[in-house]
């Protein structure tokens, strides 16, 4: 029996040795990870670090970002930067980011120039995305009809326009306003609630804001209770479900960034720019969204991606809301249409979403908004209201531009696209039939007829 016993013992011994070797290998791997990972994270502006998302943003992370933001805003907010050419701004931005990478505040290999979309993108050391705009938001209005580098020529008499002259009443709207004086009780006092999320500028000395203030008052007179939000925050954009109609009046851009540890990839997506400035406290509060790239920081200001809306309304809270976006490149650009914004809002419960492909002319955009909402408030479906606006101002902004006498339009026409239910409309009481609404639609604008004439 000695032979079999010895064989069994040898077999047991060999298995035990293999088990010990495996344990030793695992232990060595853990030691190497513990020793080498922190060293990699500390590399000079590395960029190959922390590509796996952190679970939370620490106070230290936020403090480092604020240090970087202070340097970026000191550059972009300076008089010198305002006077620079685009090429000089690019050189200054790259020099500033090189210094921030040397200090370990941004990842050096994340710095990416996107001249087509006018920005330099980068990643903070903690993994949050950032960027520097080469064209300041305040300049975007001027670029619409600037005869300078972008080669545009202003349509005739555009400089003399006011809200009343630029946005006249169409005949059907005017007739409806006149009829209101004689049939005051034909429609419910309130036909819905709307919100204008105005984030083009801070309204001080603004060339845009008077038009939106005018529209707000006009729609109030139509029975559409309209809230004007001129200090739009990320928190505000999480509460759009309170309204029947939400208007996103803000600048938009196409943001390109690099990602990946061993193989670098690039991704481009639409973003909406806000005027809400980044602070240490807010960075911590918004930490999860920042790390998940649902929020991005440009020039020290917060911006949102499609994933922001997808996450904010993941339970479908936008039930039956109509979302109308004026932002440039909300749906991407020609030959690269990106429907992520519309898809995210529809997934969040929105009934209808409208937005632009390409950069859109300022005046065309607000004229389309004006006419669409006027007819939506008269009881028309959003599809019919949009069709009327296109019949009035043109299918795209280049058609409108040339009809105004413009001679050198921009390269790609901007056009408004509707997603979702084209039959969506504002609130109609159950006891108020469509026939009655059609008869009473003429009564809705009387309160503001005199001021709009």
Residue ranges, per PLM feature:
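Bacterial N-terminal signal peptides that target proteins for export
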Residues: 15-25
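Bacterial N-terminal signal peptides
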Residues: 25-35
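Sec-dependent signal peptide cleavage junction
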Residues: 34-48
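A domain-level signal for caspase-like cysteine endopeptidase catalytic cores
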Residues: 61, 67-77, 162-283, 287
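Non-catalytic propeptide/linker segments at domain boundaries
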Residues: 80-213, 217-218, 256
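Loop/turn elements at helix/coil->beta-strand transitions in domains of secreted/extracellular proteins
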Residues: 192, 222, 241-245, 317-323, ...
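Cysteine protease catalytic core and zymogen-processing segment of caspase-like enzymes
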Residues: 255-351
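Active-site-proximal C-terminal subdomain of hydrolase catalytic domains
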Residues: 322-448, 452
């Amino acid at each position: 029996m000695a032979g079999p016993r010895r064989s069994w013992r040898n077999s047991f011994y060999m298995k035990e040795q293999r088990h010990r070797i495996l344990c030793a290998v695992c232990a060595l791997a853990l030691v190497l990870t513990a020793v080498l990972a922190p060293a990699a994270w500390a590399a000079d502006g590395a960029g190959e670090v922390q590509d796996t998302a952190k679970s939370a943003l620490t106070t230290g992370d936020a403090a480092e970002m604020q240090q970087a933001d202070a340097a970026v805003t000191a550059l972009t907010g300076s008089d010198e930067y305002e006077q620079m050419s685009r090429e000089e701004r690019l050189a200054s931005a790259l020099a500033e980011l090189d210094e921030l990478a040397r200090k370990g505040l941004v990842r050096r290999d994340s710095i990416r120039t996107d001249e087509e979309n006018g920005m330099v993108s980068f990643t903070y050391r903690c993994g949050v995305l950032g960027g520097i705009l080469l064209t300041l938001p305040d300049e975007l209005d001027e670029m619409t009809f600037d005869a300078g580098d972008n080669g545009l020529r202003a349509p005739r008499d555009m400089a003399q326009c006011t809200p009343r002259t630029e946005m006249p009443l169409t005949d059907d709207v005017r007739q409806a306003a006149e009829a209101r004086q004689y049939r005051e009780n034909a429609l419910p006092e309130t036909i819905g609630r709307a919100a204008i999320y105005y984030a083009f500028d801070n309204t001080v000395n603004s060339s845009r804001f008077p038009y939106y203030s005018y529209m707000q008052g006009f729609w109030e007179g139509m029975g559409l209770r309209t809230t004007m939000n001129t200090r739009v925050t990320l928190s505000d954009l999480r509460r759009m479900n309170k309204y029947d109609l939400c208007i996103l009046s803000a600048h938009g851009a196409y943001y390109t960034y690099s990602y990946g540890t061993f193989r670098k990839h690039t991704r481009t997506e639409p973003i909406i720019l806000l005027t809400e400035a980044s602070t240490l406290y807010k960075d911590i509060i918004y930490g999860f969204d920042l790390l998940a790239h649902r929020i991005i920081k440009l020039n020290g200001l917060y911006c949102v991606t499609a994933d922001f809306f997808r996450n904010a309304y993941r339970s479908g809270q936008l039930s039956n809301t109509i979302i109308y976006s004026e932002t440039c490149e909300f749906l991407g650009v020609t030959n690269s249409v990106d429907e992520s914004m519309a898809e995210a809002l529809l997934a969040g419960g929105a009934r209808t979403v409208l937005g632009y492909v390409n950069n859109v002319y300022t005046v065309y955009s607000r004229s389309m908004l004006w006419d669409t909402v006027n007819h939506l408030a008269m009881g028309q479906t959003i599809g019919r209201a949009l069709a009327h606006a296109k019949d009035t101002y043109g299918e795209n902004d280049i058609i409108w531009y040339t009809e105004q006498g413009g001679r050198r339009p921009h390269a790609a026409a901007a056009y408004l696209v509707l997603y979702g239910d084209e039959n969506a409309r504002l609130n109609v009481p159950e006891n108020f039939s469509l026939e009655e609404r059609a008869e009473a639609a003429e009564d809705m604008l009387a309160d503001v007829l005199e001021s709009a004439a």
